[in-house]
Amino acid sequence: MRRYDQSRHAKDVISARQIQLAWLERVLDSPDLVEADRDDPELVRHIGRIKEHGNRALRVAFNKSMGPVKIVTVYFDRKMKGRL
């Protein structure tokens, strides 16, 4: 498992959206899709399906330049429906 820290925002949305840390860690370690941020080369987005949550796509955005990586935000991405 990759080591990571969470921003205050990430902690808040994980709690509010009832996102399990196991899901976040799974997507962080084994994404179905990886996207670079076009404006910030330090930001990366990992996207993965969560079968236990209706096969929805979980998007995890993090700063890769920090050690450990810093989770910026996490959310279920409706725009990814049918794309993974």
Question: Positions of the model-derived regions?
Answer:
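Ribonuclease/tRNase effector modules and their secretory precursors
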Residues: 1-84
